[in-house]
A protein has these predicted regions:
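Extracytoplasmic cell-surface/polysaccharide-interacting catalytic and binding patches
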Residues: 25-99, 104-107, 111-210, 219-233
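Conserved metal-phosphate-binding beta-hairpin within the catalytic cores
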Residues: 215
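Short, low-complexity intrinsically disordered segments
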Residues: 6, 210-211
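Bacterial N-terminal signal peptides
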Residues: 13-22
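Bacterial N-terminal signal peptides that target proteins for export
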Residues: 2-12
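Intrinsically disordered, low-complexity segments enriched in polar/charged small residues
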Residues: 12-13, 219
Length: 233
């Protein structure tokens, strides 16, 4: 009994510490082994996670996005950190729109293509194609590389001006103008895309021909696995 009484204060203190522990201390519990929060590896990265909100081609939050954060495989995050360091030395910073994407989000895209069009959203994101044709055109897929955890959608920021570089089209503008090598943009816009592309490739990423913002780690650690844990903090 005396031993139990002596231990009680310590038990109380431990319980109190667990109750008062900041939510951020438990953050890693939501990330499977082999994955990291991008901001933990690249604190300077700006996040604009579009599928958490409504500023995306669906016009609403997408399933599986429970927080406006970015998650990647450890290998992809480390490679992206090298990209960021290189670009920062040139006066630029990276801005991330999407990284790991759960399979449930991809399934949500499939469901969305079967619904009615919102003319306002269509004019902003896919004005020249029917939503039902987005899969056939290569803009959407039933299995996304994002779900493997080593694909990232991003752009460049001018650190001094605090503005995005002009890439000739905005993120998720599902149109040929967003393709690498598009003749529909200016030389300056092409140069901005090339700066991002050459730097990403320098550190082991490969581009996607139809989308200037889309890059995948060439030696990705999970080439055949598609994950479905939520994007959460």
């Amino acid at each position: 009994m005396e031993t139990l009484i002596r231990k009680r204060p310590y038990i109380f203190i431990l319980t109190l510490l667990l109750i008062l522990m900041p939510a951020g201390c438990a953050q890693k519990a939501h990330v499977p082994e082999g994955f990291v929060y991008v901001k933990e590896v690249i604190p300077s990265a700006e996040l604009d996670i579009r599928y958490y909100g409504s500023n995306n081609f669906t016009g609403r939050p997408v399933a599986g996005y429970r927080a406006p954060t970015a998650i990647l495989s450890l290998q992809a995050a480390r490679a992206l950190a090298n990209v960021s360091k290189d670009l920062e030395s040139q006066g630029y910073a990276i801005k991330i729109f999407d990284a790991y994407r759960p399979q449930k989000a991809v399934n949500d895209f499939i469901t969305w293509t079967k619904g009615a069009d919102d003319s306002r959203i269509k004019s902003k994101f896919y004005p020249n194609i029917d939503k039902k044709d987005l899969f056939m055109a290569g803009y959407l897929a039933s299995k996304s590389g994002h779900s493997r955890g080593s694909t990232v959608d991003l752009t460049l920021m001018d650190k001094k001006k605090g503005q995005e570089l002009d890439m000739g089209s905005h993120f998720d503008y599902l149109d040929p103008v967003s393709a690498h090598g598009s003749p529909m943009i200016t030389a300056h816009q092409t140069a901005n895309r090339e700066l991002l592309k050459t730097t990403m490739e320098k550190y082991g990423f490969k581009s996607y021909s139809r989308e200037w913002w889309h890059y995948t780690l060439t030696n990705e650690p999970y080439p055949d696995r598609y994950f479905d844990f939520d994007v959460d903090e």
